[in-house]
């Protein structure tokens, strides 16, 4: 069972995983294609995909003898919802701070 939450943010905290995630935004890809141009090996890319999958951000499916990875819409939606909640709270806090009377110095 996949749970969506803080693990998503932790997973995307790694620059290589973020790059893999961004490549999957464009289209589904196999490990070899994802590894091309990255400063890590194919096995390392597989490990990064495992973390992204555990965080609920990607899913995979077999195609012949390869696995094709793509973004998991449910995981991406959950991540976006968390960001929306954070942004709403941050803007409300900023508004409240901006509306506070200021003390005059002098």
What is each PLM-predicted segment?
Residues 18-20:
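Pre-recognition alpha-helix immediately N-terminal to the DNA-recognition helix
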Residues 1-4, 11, 23-37, 42, ...:
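C-terminal regulatory/oligomerization modules of transcriptional regulators
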Residues 62-68:
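Short, Lys/Arg-rich nucleic-acid/phosphate-binding segment
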Residues 48:
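Residues within the DNA-recognition helix of helix-turn-helix
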